[in-house]
């Protein structure tokens, strides 16, 4: 079976600027109304309706109705991977002509990618997990080691429940801002939820960006050895000392 026509069909849909804007607005996993997506794409409701119908027919969007409103969301994380892949290719080797805007810096630092963390914070977490041999990464796949199972369990993540889920348990995505992998799959989503539950992170209003709270800054350093600052995040503390060699401190509710 030739995949060329399939690629061409999806590429043509995504290539239209309004449809691309609608898809981008849904990358954080939320469901938005047709009106909200029309606003995001800067088109009239009538034009938005036509675009949404085409994206739904192509299997990229899943519609749902709540009362008087009709909501749309991306049909699966695979659509997010496709969009992030396009961005990665578009940015690769492109010379930077201007400094990053504040919004771009916020997204680069930490953001939501469908249902899991992305950006510099997510990449550093993944590097900690591999350095401590909690994860073994090969290509786009990842496997939790015995030590990792103990760690994630102590951190408050039920791995047995994740393993029985219908989605892929553990994998990695290439982060389009950092050009390094970050944790995804059911485990990546559970880790993200745990950080929100601990109030270490908060969603930024009207943005995919994620804010690290004051307790989160303490927690990420104590548990993972990651220093979160306004300027940058580095694998060393502000005093220049290296991160802890063992992640022995676990959070409490």
For each of these PLM feature ranges, what is it?
Residues 13-19, 76-77, 107, 119:
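Short helix-coil-helix linker/hinge
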Residues 6-44, 70-72, 112-113:
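N-terminal helix-turn-helix DNA-binding core of bacterial DNA-binding proteins
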Residues 34-61:
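Canonical helix-turn-helix DNA-binding module
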Residues 64-89, 144, 148-151, 216:
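Basic, amphipathic "hinge/linker" alpha-helix immediately C-terminal to the N-terminal HTH DNA-binding motif
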Residues 133, 137-149:
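A contiguous pocket-lining binding segment that forms or flanks enzyme active sites
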Residues 56-66, 70-73, 138-139, 204-205:
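Beta-hairpin "wing" of winged helix-turn-helix
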Residues 1-5, 28, 80-137, 155-206, ...:
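Amphipathic alpha-helical dimerization/coiled-coil segments
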């Amino acid at each position: 079976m030739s995949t060329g026509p399939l690629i061409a069909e999806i590429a043509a849909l995504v290539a239209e600027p309004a449809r691309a804007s609608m898809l981008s607005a849904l990358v954080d996993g939320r469901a938005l109304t047709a009106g909200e997506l029309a606003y995001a794409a800067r088109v009239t409701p009538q034009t938005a309706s036509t675009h949404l119908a085409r994206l739904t027919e192509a299997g990229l969007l899943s519609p749902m109705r709540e009362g008087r409103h009709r909501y749309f969301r991306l049909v699966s994380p695979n659509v997010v991977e496709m969009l992030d892949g396009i961005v990665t290719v578009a940015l690769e080797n492109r010379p930077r002509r201007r400094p990053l805007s504040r919004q771009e810096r916020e997204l680069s630092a930490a953001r939501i990618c469908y249902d899991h963390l992305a950006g510099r914070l997510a990449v550093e977490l993944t590097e900690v997990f591999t350095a401590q041999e909690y994860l073994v990464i090969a290509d786009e796949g990842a496997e939790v080691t015995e030590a990792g199972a103990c760690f994630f369990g102590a951190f408050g993540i039920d791995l047995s429940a994740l393993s029985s889920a219908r989605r892929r348990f553990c994998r990695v995505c290439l982060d389009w801002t950092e050009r390094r992998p970050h944790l995804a799959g059911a485990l990546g989503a559970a880790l993200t939820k745990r950080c929100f539950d601990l109030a270490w992170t908060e969603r930024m209003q009207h943005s995919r960006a994620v804010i690290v709270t004051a307790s989160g800054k303490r927690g990420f350093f104590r548990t993972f050895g990651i220093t979160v600052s306004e300027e940058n995040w580095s694998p060393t503390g502000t005093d220049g000392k290296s991160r802890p060699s063992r992640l022995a401190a676990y959070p409490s509710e």
